[in-house]
């Protein structure tokens, strides 16, 4: 992965992002649901979501490809059609899919770039939401439409909605990479500013 000064991705303040007008209902009891998001380098996206209260687990991996298996070396060639993704396990009694999407679009990546994030270029770095059911698809479609109508970005959102077929967990050395390697140049330049942005604007939504 080639580092860049892309950092916090968007220069738009998260304060300019509306809350989703349509969201999944808050669960009455604790539970566990999954969301799979692709927003460039999974190290960076994982680092952001690990901070949020209600997020139970974040696993880096690969989704969206036609090949029967996935590994980092092969996915990086762009030949398998997989994207780097994070699988987020969350408690719907504490945080909603809509909140996860608000963070996805305002902090985790730039959804106006399809097959790149900063200097990371290729279909494996595409912006995508892999929906597990029609409700996840509906929540995502409506929030994208809401952001486009509000002209938050000034250019179209190009995030793809793809049905979730399979999730392949990435190699162990990729998991929790940003926390374990805070001084790595790419992490310092790209992941750390995103985490700082999250803390600045979503302080009341963070783990204590």
Residue map of PLM features:
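Flexible coil/turn and secondary-structure edge motifs
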Residues: 1-208
């Amino acid at each position: 992965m080639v580092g860049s000064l892309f950092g916090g991705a968007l220069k738009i303040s998260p304060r300019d992002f509306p809350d989703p007008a349509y969201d999944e209902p808050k669960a009455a009891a604790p539970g566990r649901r999954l969301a799979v998001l692709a927003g460039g380098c999974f190290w960076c996206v994982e680092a952001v979501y690990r901070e949020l209260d209600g997020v139970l687990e974040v696993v880096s991996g690969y989704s969206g490809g036609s090949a029967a298996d996935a590994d980092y070396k092969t996915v990086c060639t762009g030949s398998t059609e997989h994207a780097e993704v994070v699988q987020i396990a969350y408690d719907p009694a504490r945080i909603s899919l809509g909140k996860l999407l608000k963070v996805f679009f305002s902090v985790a990546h730039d959804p106006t770039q399809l097959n790149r994030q900063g200097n990371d270029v290729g279909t494996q770095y595409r912006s995508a939401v892999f929906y597990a059911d029609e409700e996840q698809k509906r929540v995502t479609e409506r929030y994208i439409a809401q952001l486009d109508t509000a002209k938050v970005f000034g250019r179209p959102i190009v995030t793809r909605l793809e049905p979730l077929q399979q999730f392949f967990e990435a190699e162990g050395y990729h998991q929790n990479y940003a926390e374990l390697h805070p001084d790595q140049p790419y992490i310092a330049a790209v992941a750390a500013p995103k985490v700082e942005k999250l803390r600045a604007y979503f302080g009341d939504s963070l783990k204590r």
